[in-house]
Amino acid sequence: MNQEVMNLFNPQAPAQTFDSIRISIASPEKILSWSYGEIKKPETINYRTFKPERDGLFCARIFGPIKDYECLCGKYKRMKYKGIICEKCGVEVTLSRVRRERMGHIELAAPVAHIWFLKSLPSRIGTLLDMTLKDIERVLYFENYIVTEPGLTSLKEHQLLSEEEYMIAVDEFGEDQFTALIGAEAIYELLASMELEKIAADLRVDLAETTSDLKQKKLMKRLKIVENFLESGNRPEWMIMKIVPVIPPDLRPLVPLDGGRFATSDLNDLYRRVINRNNRLKRLIELRAPGIIIRNEKRMLQEAVDALFDNGRRGRVITGANKRPLKSLSDMLKGKQGRFRQNLLGKRVDYSGRSVIVTGPELKLHQCGLPKKMALELFKPFIYARLDAKGYSSTVKQAKKLVEKERPEVWDILDEVIREHPVLLNRAPTLHRLGIQAFEPTLIEGKAIQLHPLVCTAFNADFDGDQMAVHVPLSLEAQLEARVLMMSTNNILHPANGAPIIVPSQDMVLGLYYLSIVAEKEPGEGMIFADMGELQHALENKVVTLHTKIKGRFKTVDAEGNPVSKIYDTTPGRMIMGELLPKNVNVPFDICNQEMTKKNISKMIDHVYRHCGQKETVIFCDRIMQLGFAHACRAGISFGKDDMVIPESKAKIVAETEALTTEYEQQYNDGLITQGEKYNKVVDAWGKATDKITEEMMARLKAVEFDPVTGRQKQMNSVYMMSHSGARGSVNQMRQLGGMRGLMAKPSGEIIETPIISNFKEGLTVNEYFNSTHGARKGLADTALKTANSGYLTRRLVDVAQDAIISEVDCGAEIGLTMQPIVDAGQIVASIGQRVLGRTALDPILHPVTGEVIVEAGRMVEEKDVEIIEKAGIQSIRIRSALTCETRNGVCAKCYGRDLARGTPVNQGEAVGVIAAQSIGEPGTQLTMRTFHLGGTAQVVDSSYLEASYEGTVKLRNRNVVRNSDGNLVVMGRNMAVLILDATGKERAVHRVTYGSRLFVDEGDTVKRGQRIAEWDPYTRPIMTEVEGYVEFEDLVDGLSVSETADESTGITKRVVIDWRSTPRGSDLKPAMVIKDKAGKILKLSKGGDARFLLSVESILSVEPGAHVKAGDVIARLPMESAKTKDITGGLPRVAELFEARRPKDHAIIAEIDGTVRFGRDYKNKRRIIIEPNDDTIEPVEYLIPKGKPFHLQDGDVIEKGEYILDGNPAPHDILAIKGVEALASYLVNEIQEVYRLQGVLINDKHIEVIVRQMLQKVEITESGDTGYIPGDHVDRIELEEINERLIEEGKKPGSGNPVLLGITKASLQTPSFISAASFQETTRVLTEAAVAGKMDTLQGLKENVIVGRLIPAGTGGMTNQIRRIATARDELIIDERRKTSGSAEANAMLVDMTNNAAE
């Protein structure tokens, strides 16, 4: 009884708890069971009375009352009649809320096909019936008959007959000898009569017998759908609808506007169409109208239902009165404005406000300034409650009045309410988790929110009019999480790379840099100070300045905490900064006794954080911020026109370069170089000139000058200080202001030959200005485009990685990755220490000399270990990685390593996938926004020489060199490398040297650091001879394969190989040069082949026939592409290409086996290359290579597995197939890092590894064994391993598969959760597929749980769910015990109690 009374006042039934959601096709019985009545009329509401029409689309009898507890005619009102059905109007007396839940239905006079199963590719109905979509549509839309039962006639089942053919057949065989139907009835009959088990068995037999790939694919597709129907219990005929469900009226409302018009949901129009046509069809059937009219009406009904479910999927889009397409049920779900993305994944929040932000330098790091007016509005309910509790008001109404009048007691209460109640601040776009942080509000006058300057970097905020939103966490748990996890003081490190993110910037950096400058000959130089008091005294009396060289005593503590002091050579400015350092034995004065550039400040904060903990760091940051602002203000550093110095030597350098370009022009006119070579040389020369001028300018700015009168050092150049300290501006921008603007790029990415010689200070000429607009505009256009692209990339990344959560501590994996330092052009760009820091060692890391263990296996590498590793010069370390982690759902903590944002091992429940996605996506947007800062200034990227990066001894791997006629050593090997070994014989550096490079060192030579090892021409690729002899041409026929091109401007001719395949006569030619001896015999090469050198298109011949050549001489050369500028434009699309695992446009061809290269018979425009394996058990492998592609292998070359046969970017799938997972991982990580490194963005490798892990989750079944899978199925890797283990135990045959690499979009759509996939992309397709298969969503990932409105299974939600599971299990145990001991009544009562407690 009491339960009933409780329910009266709390009508909301406890929300049902569920663990999974299943989707399937609704049967007609199911639709009827949902429905509360049939809708017979198309009317909506009566336009005079505004009451719903009976049996219409808004009927109150079917859907429920319009007002709470009141029937339509008004006979029954109030609660006491709850549940009564009025006998006059037939309306149940209940809550009007049921109009949101109750559905209706329409009985169709003729069956219609469900458009999703018909048109969503691949068509389910088509695949099931094994008919083409066109044929099915012909039957559905009443063009052709289809034979459903051929009987004993010569007709075949599923045969289509036109009207005439049908008539002829009827005449010939008689009407009852066979059955042929038309329209959806026909398809319904066919589907209903399918015997799925038998079809599945037949298909399996066919599959085993067929040999053709195409047939196999087709059969497999069909088998899959048949199996789906069998497993899910769906019936095929349910794809044809006889009853259409009608959604509740409050979900498709009709709202009266003023002026007697109505705003209606499009669905009402679509339903109205269906009802009208259905009723007309019923009437026509009753009237026994002619067949053709009925058919037409049936077709129109089919079209109306199609439009209702998915408008525009077939035929014309149905538009409303204003020519706007009507929004169908599918459109309600799809896209950014659809149900999933608009309302389920993102919602508008109560208790929030937004305002402009201004800087609040006097705030502490954990505070923000909240305008009083805003706080009053946001915290209203809390204020009402407190007013009531304090007795200022007795009702809510009174409290409201008090607040509206803004009485003084209200302000006091607001202070109380706000104290220790954190609020969340968010700045859009929220690109990573630091875009929302919690602060404690302090009340301020005014209307703008005050933000602490140090958190600006995290929010990417500036104060030029940015706005931020404030949200109030209401529940105690929410406040707790905000305080413990989201407080700005808890987010000191950047989750992407573990570097501090609370770093002073701009003014603060400038102030601190100014403080730390040392100047010569300042007053008081050489004085010694005992403590800060003395120093302050001296400063105030101007005995010393901030920059004087002095000796000072710095006080700190030793390891036991006893005060100690030490004397340093320093300056008063640095002493003031040192005063702020926390007193700790590990924080020496040295870290601030240096020039405080932004980098050094960041290092200092990091150091303090590592050794003194979070609290000290926060206090320290606040104090150096105050100090920085104060001194930036006092220093008065400003930017003046004359601070930009134009170097005197500029004119000279420009004149020299102009002379050079004239010379190149002349060489080109004389025919010594080609147009392309000239262009490259000119661009190169101007590039060098720009660099030279920049160097001179920087030298002038850096120069220290002394005042002739006082003898004191003049103040440093202000602009140089700004740039050098890292506060603002780069060398690049200074070059454009004071040096020369340099080369510009066209919008296409090509560099314009004529540079901009002027700088902005001198001003540009008209022509220069025009050229400069190219680059500038491209920058702006790029920015707009790429912001969108980058956001989309982030979205795809988040989607693919959202269910990577730390779910256990250790998975016990015994495999991992090998880390090595990354070397680029001889420079170490990422040291091994940086790469292994915060990762778990897989094997013990041993010292190479002493052999002692530096890090045990399974321990995380810390900063102190990194120092030892770097000193020891270890070159490769095996570590655990998320990529090789063997956890079933998610990743384990050991494989992941350190949580970068906390600096400690990662916690269970951390959503590492989302963090990885944000870390990769966030700089994407930054990068895109950064292009235009360079204003499109070109940066040429081509090096033409190699310098030693270490001292040591040279060793040549795969040595193959000759001396050419000039006496230089020339590289003849294709895969030769120069190694530099240190004194202990360890490899310090490995450099690949390209074919045709000139070597300046040989095996065993010693080199100094910076010494040139080799050089080459970056713009052409030479073809050289290995043997001495006489040149003879083969198939070099003038006009066919070779043309004498006279340069237009010079008239000088050169001979170029042209595309010989373009004419029929030239199709069999193989242009080549042969080297013969005096007797005319072809010479042999060292590898045994003939000395024949095949030439590709565009090769320029460097020798005449009959010429005498020596080994190493160039006989032809191939011009390379002109240098394109590197810009993130190549970057973002490149990152997307890698993550989407697309095959690059002209991708490299990789050798699959070790062996020898042989040339096979050529095709018309392909060249056949055969690799004969070294191992006789393997078959030779053939490759077809487009002719005319620059191709560098010769017949007889030895090639190793994984080497490139044709250069280019390799396709990631090939790397996976040939070299395996680890090689793929390191390729992807390095390529993606390369793009970000170019922009100076640091991202930890582990983030990329997490994403790659998600891309590699599936294997493609090759041998199905007894697994029940079909070859070609994509199955979860770990799932297959588990099934195989079980099969082996049972003594059955396990299945096998190859790992497949899926792009991130594909991987997201293949997640086991259909809810997550549907909310990502291609909603209709995903839902159709899921419904046919009767898929179950177990709600494992984050997205599905957000959509169904539960706590996500990560972080605190993971714990809560775990506790809930344990509690339920225990309750069940207790109840079972009780059941055994006492009667069932008591146990049931207990159950009821428990459910109620849970609900509350």
Curated annotation (Swiss-Prot):
One BP term from GO: DNA-templated transcription
Recorded catalytic reaction(s): these are: RNA(n) + a ribonucleoside 5'-triphosphate = RNA(n+1) + diphosphate
Checking Gene3D superfamilies in the record gives:
1.10.132.30, 1.10.150.390, 1.10.1790.20, 1.10.40.90, 2.40.40.20, 2.40.50.100, RNA polymerase II, clamp domain, RNA polymerase Rpb1, domain 3
Q: What is a single molecular function from GO for this protein?
A: DNA binding
Keywords attached to this Swiss-Prot or TrEMBL record, sorted alphabetically, are:
DNA-directed RNA polymerase, Magnesium, Metal-binding, Nucleotidyltransferase, Transcription, Transferase, Zinc
Q: Which InterPro entries match?
A: DNA-dir_RpoC_beta_prime, DNA-dir_RpoC_beta_prime_bact, RNA_pol_asu, RNA_pol_N, RNA_pol_Rpb1_1, RNA_pol_Rpb1_3, RNA_pol_Rpb1_3_sf, RNA_pol_Rpb1_4
**Which metal ions or organic cofactors does this protein require, according to UniProt?**
Mg(2+); Zn(2+)
Q: Would I find Acetylation among this entry's keywords?
A: no
What does this protein do, in the record's words? DNA-dependent RNA polymerase catalyzes the transcription of DNA into RNA using the four ribonucleoside triphosphates as substrates.
- Protein family according to the UniProt entry: Belongs to the RNA polymerase beta' chain family.
Can you say what this protein is called? Answer: DNA-directed RNA polymerase subunit beta'
Q: Which gene encodes it?
A: rpoC
